[in-house]
A protein has these predicted regions:
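Two-component/phosphorelay signaling modules centered on CheY-like receiver
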Residues: 12-31
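Acidic catalytic/metal-coordinating carboxylates
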Residues: 35-38, 61-64
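Conserved sequence signature across two-component system core domains
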Residues: 8-9, 33, 51
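Active-site beta3 strand of CheY-like receiver
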Residues: 46-52
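Receiver (REC) domain active-site loop signature in two-component systems and cognate sites
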Residues: 57
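Conserved phosphotransfer cores of two-component systems
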Residues: 44-46, 69-76
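Short, conserved "switch-loop" micro-motifs in signal-transduction and mechanochemical regulators
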Residues: 84-87
């Protein structure tokens, strides 16, 4: 059975690229969010098997969203990714 994945990134182009790669490899993208606030909301609604989340986003950043999601579901699987490079967090 295909794994259900939630993609979170403020860049629509990145969401589209990630979704394309995942679906071509047999994964089911159940939702997308453009910021951390929407990610928290969508996680609660969809309960995906995995979340792929950007770090730097408007409204609520990925780190804050990660903490909120893990606070409500300690078993949540979340991969954080970013194009930040070597900047200090």
């Amino acid at each position: 059975m295909a794994k259900n994945i939630l993609i979170v990134d403020d860049a629509a182009f990145m969401r589209m690229m990630i979704k394309d790669i995942l679906t071509k490899n047999g994964y089911n993208v159940v939702g997308e969010a453009e910021n951390g606030a929407k990610a928290i909301e969508k996680y609660g609604e969809l309960k995906p098997d995995l979340v792929l989340m950007d770090i730097t986003m408007p409204e609520v950043d990925g780190i804050a969203a990660l903490k909120k999601i893990k606070g409500s579901d300690p078993n949540a699987l979340i991969i954080m990714c970013s194009a930040m490079g070597q900047q200090a967090m």
